């Protein structure tokens, strides 16, 4: 048992050193019990690009809740941690750091640059693990993995080679998304589309014979130097006679052909389109159909090359302005049509991507996608929570394109392909024998290795490894909806292809963390929250409680310090209840408490309130477990909160004072036993969510760690509907009296007369048997319970099931004085309403003030109106009493 609980809850003291103690005790490792059912989770590996944000804290908290509960339920649990090398993201960070010293990666060379990246990785991996510790994550560090570990790299090479042998990985020259800042290819889902201000630039391409001009329009006039044709629809009567003739490309003054192609839409624009096969995916296809040259006019950094003539060396956007100016000078510019359009931007660097002809490696997706879709109709399907994300997954799979997997980076898995001077390609898990071979310098997309994470971390391709046989497929994946396409989908099709199984049985999808106003957290808005700052102020348990109760699966959650205050207050309440129970414990052990609780359940000891709280505890255990199984942690948290704060603390703990302050020692022992037992069960129910404080309090009542303690289960012998109904009726009486006191402004300390007129003989007997509880909570001067109670004229009345409750008012208050007080109160709120109404009726204020300021005034108005209306009701009631 640990030291006595401090008088005040201090999360810093409670959490200090606790995580290291858990690690020293090896409580996070799998039990190794072969009779136990395995339950495994692989952590979505965070990028080693920096510190973890609040979204990571949410994601990992949900996983820890799941794994801690399953561990307590006796499962053989494995939560495998690890990190992702995050190719483009990490390389960009390291390049930015080097740039501060005026150094580029090219100055260092590949080997020395990679040394710098490994230093970065070690630095931030240590930071991430420190953050995991502060969050209390119960991961098994003995199995920690990194996506560039040799074992995982072996898996990557094997998958690449096997897919290549099947013809599902190929190399070719196609239009891809190019990031000019990172100088690498990007896959479609690494491109974010943003609406930006732009223009259609209309220009004339003169026929070679000078007879007429054809008007074309483009949003990227700087690519015109790569035009190798213009296209018209072969069924367009306006132009079909021109097919086969030439137009003159302005500025360069070279002839290019007019081709007939269905790509040209007669209904759109002039019906004539310029064809730039090396800079547009649709034009690329037109070029293939008509055997057009592919002219790339840009360098990999987004500057124009020598094929752009006088614009050689200019940045693409500077070239755009210069080209438009030149077109205007030579009379080829028709008009500039301003508009807003969607432009793809690099997810990592934020710059507009450039569609560009490039030789890359691709994964052929058609059969892999078909396999993944078909699997969702089998018993081995992946279950999504909420289920609607299954449709999201299937929709993406049905419309997926081939995946460009090569990246022009240095940090990552180098592609296992080698070339020789004869133009031969060798693809293998190891380098080819002999001289003259040079390995492809590109690396694989980060998501290629991440897609293998659930099984590569378990030892695959060694299918006989203990972890692979025991813990794969994994049980549950927890992740955000923003990476279903990037990661979840790819893990599913790769796992099905290489293991024949789904990678996980369940996928729990959560949303995004937003600020109080519902905005996404970002550096540009300056509204990001560091979870470590929150932990320093409130403790990890309070943050975890907020994150687990913030929303339902698939929904976003709004962070607010007001909610954090509420979380801390709840834990403080638990702390204070625990101290009260322990201070009144008198050396009672948990084993003895369990024996006494069994007697209460059997009806051999205790009173109705003891049986009631055990009944409600039992219901709480059932509902919490049921909602945990559905990953409805918010619902489970709400149930726990209501039981702990409302039923246990506010009612049962207060009701026990009737016994604990009496002289009946036998009853005291029973009451202490129920208190201690219920506290023990509460701590176990709460532990997956708030591990630190529950461990601290658990140490006061039991040996060993709560981490490996048994999770509560429903006990049929605790069911007692009769006791539950009886105590609920007692509570109704007490609440009614309290509410009536408040309505007529009578202090709780003032003794009053209470008359309870019953219409149910059983209830009458029950109230009289438990009259002391009513007295303790209502402070009566006179209390009468009977079917024929005599009721005076001037009373406050309320009705509950089976009884009517009356408070005679003649001696309690002066109705005229109370009416005067209420009228004065009403005038006060009318004044407040007038002031806020005046402000909100000011159009300039509403138009110019910040939205949150206006909303605050509207909230005030709503609050003041509610107070005003409540007083009006009170005045009406008082006037009725006078009559």
Curated annotation (Swiss-Prot):
Residue span of motif 'KMSKS' region: 520-524
Which intervals of this chain are the motif 'HIGH' region? 46-56
Principal location class: cytoplasm
- Family annotation (SUPFAM superfamilies): Anticodon-binding domain of a subclass of class I aminoacyl-tRNA synthetases (SSF47323), Nucleotidylyl transferase (SSF52374), tRNA-binding arm (SSF46589), ValRS/IleRS/LeuRS editing domain (SSF50677)
Alphabetical GO CC annotations of the entry are: cytosol
* Gene3D superfamilies, per database record: HUPs, Isoleucyl-tRNA Synthetase, Domain 1, Valyl-tRNA synthetase, C-terminal domain, Valyl/Leucyl/Isoleucyl-tRNA synthetase, editing domain
Top-level EC class as recorded in UniProt: ligase
Q: Where does ATP bind?
A: 523
Subcellular compartments: Cytoplasm
Molecular function via GO: aminoacyl-tRNA deacylase activity; ATP binding; valine-tRNA ligase activity
Would I find Ligase among this entry's keywords?
yes
Stated family: Belongs to the class-I aminoacyl-tRNA synthetase family. ValS type 1 subfamily.
Describe its partners and assembly state. Answer: Monomer.
Q: What is this protein called?
A: Valine--tRNA ligase
């Amino acid at each position: 048992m640990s030291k006595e609980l401090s008088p005040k809850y201090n999360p810093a003291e409670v959490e200090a050193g606790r995580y290291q103690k858990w690690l020293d005790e090896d409580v996070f490792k799998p039990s190794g019990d072969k009779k136990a059912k395995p339950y495994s989770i692989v952590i979505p590996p965070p990028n080693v690009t920096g510190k973890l944000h609040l979204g990571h804290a949410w994601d990992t908290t949900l996983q820890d809740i799941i794994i801690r509960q399953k561990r307590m339920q006796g499962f053989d649990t494995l939560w495998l941690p690890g990190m992702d090398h995050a190719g483009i993201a990490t390389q960009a960070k390291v390049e930015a750091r080097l740039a501060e010293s005026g150094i580029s990666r090219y100055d260092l060379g590949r080997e020395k640059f990679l040394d710098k990246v490994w230093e970065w990785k070690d630095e931030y991996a240590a930071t991430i693990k420190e953050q995991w510790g502060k969050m209390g994550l119960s991961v098994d560090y003995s199995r920690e993995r990194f996506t560039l570990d040799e074992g995982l790299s072996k898996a990557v090479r094997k998958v690449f080679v096997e897919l290549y042998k099947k013809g599902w990985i190929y190399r070719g020259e196609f239009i891809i998304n190019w990031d000019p800042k990172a100088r690498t290819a990007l896959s479609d889902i690494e491109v974010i589309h943003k609406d930006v201000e732009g223009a259609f630039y209309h220009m004339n391409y003169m026929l070679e014979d000078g007879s007429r001009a054809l008007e074309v329009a483009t949003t990227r006039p700087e690519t015109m130097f790569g035009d190798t044709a213009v296209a018209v629809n072969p069924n367009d009567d306006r132009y079909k006679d021109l097919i086969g003739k030439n137009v003159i490309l302005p500025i360069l003054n070279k002839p290019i052909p007019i081709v007939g192609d269905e790509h040209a839409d007669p209904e759109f624009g002039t019906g004539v389109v310029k064809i730039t096969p090396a800079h547009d995916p649709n034009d690329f296809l037109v070029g293939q159909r008509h055997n057009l040259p592919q002219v790339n006019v840009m360098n990999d950094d987004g500057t124009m090359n020598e094929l752009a003539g006088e614009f050689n060396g200019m940045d693409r956007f500077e070239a755009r302005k210069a080209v438009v100016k030149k077109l205007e000078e030579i009379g080829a510019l028709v008009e500039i049509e301003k508009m807003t359009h969607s432009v793809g931007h690099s997810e990592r660097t934020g710059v507009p991507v450039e569609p560009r002809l490039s030789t890359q490696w691709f994964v052929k997706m058609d059969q892999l996608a078909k396999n993944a879709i078909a699997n969702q109709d089998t018993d081995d399907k992946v279950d999504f929570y909420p289920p609607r994300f299954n449709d999201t997954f299937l929709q993406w799979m049905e419309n997926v394109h081939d995946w460009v997997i090569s990246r022009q980076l240095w940090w990552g898995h180098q592609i296992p392909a080698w070339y020789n001077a004869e133009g031969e390609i060798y693809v293998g898990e190891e380098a080819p024998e002999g001289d003259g071979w040079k390995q492809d310098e590109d690396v694989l997309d980060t998501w290629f290795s991440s897609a293998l994470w659930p099984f590569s971390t378990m030892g695959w391709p060694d299918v006989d490894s203990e972890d692979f046989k025991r813990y794969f497929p994994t049980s549950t994946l927890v992740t955000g909806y923003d990476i279903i396409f990037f990661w979840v989908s790819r893990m599913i099709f790769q796992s099905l292809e290489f293991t024949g199984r789904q990678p996980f049985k369940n996928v729990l999808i959560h949303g995004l963390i937003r600020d109080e106003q519902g905005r996404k957290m970002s550096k540009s808005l300056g509204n990001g929250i560091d979870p470590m700052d929150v932990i320093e102020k409130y403790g990890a348990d309070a943050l975890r409680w907020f994150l687990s109760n913030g929303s339902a699966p698939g929904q976003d959650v709004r962070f607010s310090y007001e909610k954090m205050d509420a979380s801390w207050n709840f834990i403080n309440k638990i702390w204070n209840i625990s101290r009260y129970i322990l201070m009144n414990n008198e050396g009672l052990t948990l084993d003895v408490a369990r024996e006494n609780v069994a007697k209460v359940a059997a009806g051999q000891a205790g009173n109705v309130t003891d049986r009631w709280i055990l009944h409600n505890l039992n219901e709480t255990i059932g509902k919490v477990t049921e909602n945990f199984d559905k990953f409805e942690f918010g619902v489970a948290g709400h149930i726990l909160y209501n039981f702990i704060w409302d039923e246990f603390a506010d009612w049962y703990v207060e009701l026990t004072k009737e016994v604990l302050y009496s002289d009946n020692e036998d009853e005291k022992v029973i009451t202490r036993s129920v208190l201690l037992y219920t506290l023990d069960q509460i701590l176990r129910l709460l532990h997956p969510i708030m591990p630190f404080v529950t461990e601290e309090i658990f140490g006061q009542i039991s040996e060993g760690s709560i981490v490996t303690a048994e999770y509560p289960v429903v006990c049929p012998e605790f069911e007692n509907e009769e006791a539950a109904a009886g105590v609920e009726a007692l509570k109704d009486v007490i609440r009614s009296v309290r509410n009536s006191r408040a309505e007529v402004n009578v202090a709780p300390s003032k003794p009053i007369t209470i008359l309870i007129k019953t219409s149910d003989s059983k209830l009458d007997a029950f109230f009289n048997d438990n009259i002391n509880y009513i007295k303790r909570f209502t402070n009566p001067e006179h209390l009468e319970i009977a079917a024929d109670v005599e009721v005076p004229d001037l009373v406050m009345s309320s009705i509950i099931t089976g009884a009517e409750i009356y408070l005679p008012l003649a001696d309690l208050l002066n109705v005229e004085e109370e009416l005067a007080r209420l009228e004065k109160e009403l005038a006060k709120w009318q004044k407040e309403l007038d002031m806020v109404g005046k402000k909100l009726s000011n159009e300039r204020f509403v138009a110019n003030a910040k939205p949150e300021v206006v909303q605050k005034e509207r909230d005030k108005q709503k609050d003041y109106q509610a107070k005003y209306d409540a007083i009006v009701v009170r005045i009406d009631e008082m006037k009725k009493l006078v009559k």
